[in-house]
């Protein structure tokens, strides 16, 4: 049997981390078994579905590089197929037309709730032989079995049983002729030959209804696996107050897709004590049997740690391709300065996100208008004038511009003036970067370049001279 899974989001909002984890698990399961992964857009909610949400879902899947083998399929383009199946069910007697008014259904609901009963349709039209005109408004309901039970072996949770007496006669076509979500899902899974449905635990109650419809159609029933919810680190359902919940928001915040995927795969699944997984390792090791039944807690600090790890372990050239977007967001012109791959090497240890990296690299490419006030007050004092003059001259004399030779120039200045490296290094750092913090000074000065570094030292000397004149 060829394994076939699907990810079927509703385009009523962005791709959130819970949906992304479900997509990842479905994708990994298919890849592990050499099967196929289908992308299906469940856009039957015409009022809430938007083109922007569809685009956001596709953007998120593409950014995570969860490539699909079929699709994307859109349910709104399959209404003719759904209605044809409903008509067949009406002919076969496995579905029936219901003419009950909203007022009657509301009254029935109130009466049942007053008795402490679970609200459900009472089957009035199922057993009615009353004649109705063809143009009289009605819905179509599925004639759910009235006895027995539905048992399915959840691939994560084990056997789950529902009594058919607990299940309603589900509406499968509305009065406007549009098919409903639960019915469309069934026909799609049947037509697309889905073998394994991996989805959130909030769909468990839909499963017995969908199984009964599949059996009524004499269609094969797929295996089901329901993944637990994701909570915030406070144990409450994950929401915006816990931080970003949109996949693309994590992109915007400077996370690498490898970091988010690695974090999401471990959010409910494990393989021993291993924490870091390449995509290939995920595919090789993933199994539904190792997915936890318990809810997972989202820990932003752990994700940040993973992101920092990947910034420093993936090829700098690759990280630079993702950094480019953030550089553009900051409107930094990188034509005059180090290559972005070199920048990744320079700032990787200091920066935990690519956004942070982009926001802290401007001095490598553009001159700054003023020095950081606190850093200048502390380090650009009259006592720093001589060290800056000497190191400027030694840097000017370098013919082979390299980080090693920059280091020698700084060390030679300290030796000549018989002062500690800090007496030379800190004023020099503020002079060339405008701030009191940077990567190692030799590689920083080298990356900024000889001409620009000397110009900035002269600017700092001018700042010191002006400061002296005001005393």
Swiss-Prot record:
One of its GO terms (cellular component) is cytosol. Binds 1 zinc ion per subunit. Its cofactor is Zn(2+). Its EC number is 6.1.1.17. A motif ('KMSKS' region) lies at residues 237-241. Keywords: Aminoacyl-tRNA synthetase, ATP-binding, Cytoplasm, Ligase, Metal-binding, Nucleotide-binding, Protein biosynthesis, Zinc. One of its GO terms (biological process) is glutamyl-tRNA aminoacylation. It catalyses: tRNA(Glu) + L-glutamate + ATP = L-glutamyl-tRNA(Glu) + AMP + diphosphate. ATP binds at residue 240. Belongs to the class-I aminoacyl-tRNA synthetase family. Glutamate--tRNA ligase type 1 subfamily. Monomer. PANTHER family: GLUTAMATE--TRNA LIGASE, GLUTAMATE--TRNA LIGASE, MITOCHONDRIAL-RELATED. This is Glutamate--tRNA ligase. It comes from Salmonella choleraesuis (strain SC-B67).
């Amino acid at each position: 049997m060829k394994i076939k899974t699907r990810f079927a989001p509703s385009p009523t909002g962005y791709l959130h981390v819970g949906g992304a984890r479900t997509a990842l698990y479905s994708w990994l399961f298919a890849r592990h078994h050499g099967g196929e992964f289908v992308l299906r857009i469940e856009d039957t909610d015409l009022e809430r579905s938007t083109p922007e949400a569809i685009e956001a879902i596709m953007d998120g899947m593409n950014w995570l590089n969860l490539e699909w083998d079929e699709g994307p399929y859109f349910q709104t383009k399959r209404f003719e197929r759904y209605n044809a199946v409903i008509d067949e069910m009406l002919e076969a007697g496995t579905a029936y037309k219901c003419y009950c008014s909203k007022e009657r259904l509301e009254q029935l609901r109130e009466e049942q709730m007053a008795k402490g009963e679970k609200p459900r349709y009472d089957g009035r039209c199922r057993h009615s032989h009353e004649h109705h005109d063809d143009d009289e408004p009605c819905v179509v309901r599925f004639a759910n079995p009235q006895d027995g039970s539905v048992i399915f072996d959840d691939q994560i949770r084990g056997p789950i049983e529902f009594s058919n007496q607990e299940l309603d006669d589900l509406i499968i076509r509305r009065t406007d002729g549009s098919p409903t979500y639960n019915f469309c899902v069934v026909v799609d899974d049947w037509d697309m030959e889905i073998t394994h449905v991996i989805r959130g635990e909030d769909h468990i109650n839909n499963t017995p209804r969908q199984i009964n419809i599949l059996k009524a159609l004499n269609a094969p029933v797929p295996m089901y696996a329901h993944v637990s919810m994701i909570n915030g680190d406070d144990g409450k359902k994950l929401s915006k107050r816990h931080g970003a919940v949109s996949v693309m928001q994590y992109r915007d915040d400077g996370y690498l897709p490898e970091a988010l995927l690695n974090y999401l795969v471990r959010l409910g699944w494990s393989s021993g004590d291993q924490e870091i997984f390449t995509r290939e390792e995920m595919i090789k090791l993933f199994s539904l049997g190792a997915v936890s039944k318990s809810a997972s807690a989202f820990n932003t600090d752990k994700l940040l740690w993973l992101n920092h790890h990947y910034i420093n372990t993936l090829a700098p050239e690759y990280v630079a391709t993702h950094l480019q977007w953030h550089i553009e967001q900051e409107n930094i012109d990188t034509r005059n300065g180090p290559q972005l791959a070199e920048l990744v090497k320079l700032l990787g240890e200091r920066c935990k996100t690519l956004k942070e990296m982009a926001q802290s690299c401007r001095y490598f490419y553009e001159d700054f208008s003023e020095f950081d006030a606190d850093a200048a007050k502390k380090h650009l004092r009259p006592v720093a004038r001589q060290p800056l003059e000497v190191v400027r001259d030694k840097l000017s004399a370098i013919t082979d511009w390299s980080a090693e030779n920059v280091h020698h120039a700084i060390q030679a200045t300290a030796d000549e003036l018989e002062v500690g490296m800090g007496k030379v290094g800190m004023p020099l750092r503020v002079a060339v970067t405008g701030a009191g913090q940077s990567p190692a000074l030799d590689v920083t000065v080298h990356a900024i370049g000889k001409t620009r570094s000397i110009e900035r030292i002269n600017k700092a000397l001018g700042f010191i001279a002006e400061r002296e004149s005001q005393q």
